Amino acid sequence: MNFSDIKKIPFFKNHIFEHVIETGSTNDNIKAKTKKSDFIHCLQLADFQTAGRGQYNRKWVSEKSGESLMFSFSAELPCDSFPASLIGGIAMSGALRGLSVNCKNLWLKWPNDLWYKNGKLGGILTESSIIDGKILCVIGIGINISAINDKSLNTSCVNEFAPEITKEILLKAFCEEWDKIIYYDSVALSKLWRD
């Protein structure tokens, strides 16, 4: 993965970027980094997670045979900020809508899921702590790019409506959208969430 275009996006210009083939959980990896005294903001992308999870510690199913976009990043937000998981959902929805005109059946499910038609497309897990009057968030995102083999799960995938979108294209579009909306006020973000 080439992160050179993402490094130019203002919000992410001071982040370090890592691409790992396999890991337990990108959220856990970023959280561990935030505890170090020489902490530098980071975005970590994984091809496969063995211990990925969602809200309420629900297991995030990823397959080596199916392609998913799985990444986590750190962000400092003001204490009065709109919830980061909602901003993440709005940014991912905006990124997908910007890449494909076939997104009319894409919707956000409270509080942290993206759905396409009647299947879960992905989710956002945010873990936060307050440090020096700011919220330090670790935002983890998992999006199904292609279909997963477990048919017992009610899932959908990006390739159902936009087969041209790869995880590299979607990651860049998400980062651009996050950078665009992160400092919107709550009224503007609420409107985007409802739309």
Residue ranges and their predicted role:
Residues 1-101:
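N-terminal lobe of the biotin/lipoate ligase/transferase fold
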Residues 78-105, 116-195:
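Long, positively charged amphipathic alpha-helical accessory segments at protein N-termini or as interdomain linkers
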